[in-house]
Regions:
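Conserved PLP-enzyme active-site core in the AAT-like
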Residues: 1-128, 133, 139
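Conserved small-domain helix->loop->beta segment predominantly found in fold-type I
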Residues: 117-173
Length: 173
């Protein structure tokens, strides 16, 4: 949460309650909201996963992912065993590159969020744009949920719907 490209935001706490009442686990794709922005596990998620290739690494020069668990469980034990047996561990160079990216994660996410907000506000009043999809805008239908779940930053990605035809949209790009 939020999903791409519509940037709808799931209320993690409410989804967690529903999942747990049904005896299910809540797994959150937190790739677009790294841990410096949103603490998915604190909001009730059982598992949070990230594409470490994106925000966490910051340079797109590795292929990696990360899973975080709210508590040690049988699912954790099973996945840990699979990891051990299949050798799905980062090599030392990729681990170094990931650590390099993590050192600047807070600053990059902060600046990306600021820049995305500026772009969202600019496009929100643009004559060729029908709609801006960005949870940081107060006009976004899930703005209050996003505001509650984040540290006041809303991420560095947004979508726009261009007025007119597909050709018009291609011309804008």
């Amino acid at each position: 949460t939020p999903n791409n490209p519509n940037w709808e935001v799931t209320d993690i706490s409410s989804a967690s309650e529903l999942a747990h009442k049904a005896g299910a686990k809540l797994i959150v794709d937190a790739t677009a909201t790294p841990p410096t922005m949103t603490k998915s596990l604190n909001l009730g998620a059982d598992i949070s996963f990230h594409s470490a290739t994106k925000y966490l690494n910051g340079h797109s020069d590795i292929a990696a992912g990360a899973l975080s668990f709210n508590q040690q469980s049988s699912m954790y034990e099973n996945l840990f065993t699979i990891r051990k047996l299949h050798g799905t561990v980062l090599n030392s160079q990729d681990a170094f590159l990931l650590i390099r990216g993590l050192r600047t994660l807070f600053l990059r996410v902060e600046k990306n969020s600021q820049n995305a907000m500026l772009l969202a506000k600019h496009f929100n009043n643009h004559e060729f744009i029908e709609k801006v999809l960005y949870p940081g805008l107060e006009t976004h239908p899930n703005h209050q949920i996003a505001k509650h779940q984040t540290n006041g930053q809303f991420g560095g990605m947004l979508s726009v719907i261009v007025k007119g035809s597909q050709t018009d949209a291609i011309n804008v790009v």
